[in-house]
Amino acid sequence: MHLLILLPALCVLGAHSAPLSYTYLQHRIQEKPQKDHGRLQFNSLHYPHIKGLLNAHGSWNPPRCGVPDIPAPPDSSSGRNRQKRFVLSGGRWDKTNLTYKIIRFPWQLSKVKVRRTIAEALKVWSEVTPLTFTEVHEGRSDIIIDFTRYWHGDNLPFDGPGGILAHAFFPKTHREGDVHFDYDEAWTIGNNIGTDLLQVAAHEFGHMLGLQHSSISKSLMSPFYTFRYPLSLSADDKHGIQFLYGAPRPPTPSPTPRVEVNQVENESNEIPAAEPDACKTNFDAVSTIRGELFFFKSGYVWRLRGGKLQNGYPALASRHWRGIPDTVDAAFEDSVGNIWFFYGSQFWVFDGKLQASGPFPITDIGISVTQIQAAFVWGTEKNKKTYLFRGGEYWRFNPETRRVESRHSRRIGDWRGVPKGIDAAFQDEQGYAYFVKGRQYWKFDPFKVRVMDGYPHLISQDFFNCQASSTFVNSLR
């Protein structure tokens, strides 16, 4: 049986001096203060992984959530001190379809980016439960998200930059669903220069749904704030939230009749303010990375493995590559596992540990253009070459020297049947090349060295099993 503990409604995520946050909370919840040595002994016992994070004076260095850590009791049936890992707050939502509203936004980030990140943080929990989250802009909502300052009406003031980052209230309390972020923090997305909004929000939403802290060091619900990418739930997080709400409901499949495509006009249906729909949009870039196919659009990425879209996608690309630009023009993986991203007149390189270098100007590679529209690696295993495309021209590129083989471009007409102005290109396991433009793609035969008969096809149907809209079907006739 899992332990249910009735705790105060508050979770506070602190940025710097955890002892101050801890003492502050003790005062707020009117608990008897502990001596420092007792607090350290307690946490070393129940959170052994943090011993190395204490300095010589026994002070806490890592940022952490300020709620006192209440461990599960010993397992009396076994006679051993076997701990229950996740802990529940004592409450849960009585419904699974929840609405949320964002009242105010941080000054450093656009509303579009904040909305996108909040939706992504909620999706971390909805993809493993039956929960759904819908943003509303008017009227009442179940969840209130606010970026506010100092004293703001709940007797739990923020303290300006640093210190307290955010707090949330548990279900079945007088302020259930309230999640507050300190407006004055240096909020960022996808990097550790400031405070990463995605990771803080996902942690706070776990409390808002009813989870307390976990004693697992790599758990999202660990009290210690760690900048970690890609963001994902640990098994402990998943067990805890599914104990409250159950597993996700299986999707209901729907028939997807195929539409034959002979000729399709280039269409664009960018949805910048919301999560893009793969069935209705074009793509900024497509690339084969680590044997999987990634589609990029407006800061989001779809991940296909073995031709199947993976659960939890689309997701923010920054969950995989911290520091990636919001939009990607082209991407490819080189022979040693580095991943290259191009946007505008710059490029970034992520090494095998996903550490980024850059941005660098495109002129560094030996060409005087302001954008690369597509890039891919093509050829046999022993004779792979990297190609960069822009408009009606292309270059062969050497990632080892970071230079093009010749600053003089070649004509895309060398790739018989491939249109000018492609948006992306990639190669499959059989050696066939794919060229993407708008919502269509052309399959290129490596043996006949030309586009195969019957192309272009629709990306949405062949890769995402979408049914074409009647408007789009009529445009094909």
Curated annotation (Swiss-Prot):
Binds 1 Ca(2+) ion per subunit. It is found in: Secreted, Extracellular space, Extracellular matrix. Residues 1-17 form the signal peptide. One of its GO terms (cellular component) is extracellular space. Hemopexin repeats lie at residues 280-324, 325-369, 370-418, 419-466. Keywords: Calcium, Cleavage on pair of basic residues, Collagen degradation, Disulfide bond, Extracellular matrix, Hydrolase, Metal-binding, Metalloprotease, Protease, Repeat, Secreted, Signal, Zinc, Zymogen. The keyword Translocase does not apply. Residues 64-83 are annotated as: Disordered. PROSITE patterns: CYSTEINE_SWITCH, HEMOPEXIN, HEMOPEXIN_2, ZINC_PROTEASE. Disulfide bonds join 279-466. Zn(2+) 2 binds at residues 65, 203, 207, 213. Residues 18-85 form a propeptide. Zn(2+) 1 binds at residues 152, 154, 167, 180. GO terms for biological process: collagen catabolic process; extracellular matrix organization; proteolysis. Expressed in fibroblast cells that are activated by thyroid hormone. High levels in resorbing tail. Transmembrane segments: none annotated. SUPFAM superfamilies: Hemopexin-like domain, Metalloproteases ('zincins'), catalytic domain. One of its GO terms (molecular function) is metalloendopeptidase activity. May be involved in the modification of the extracellular matrix during metamorphic apoptosis. Belongs to the peptidase M10A family. This is Stromelysin-3. The gene is mmp11.
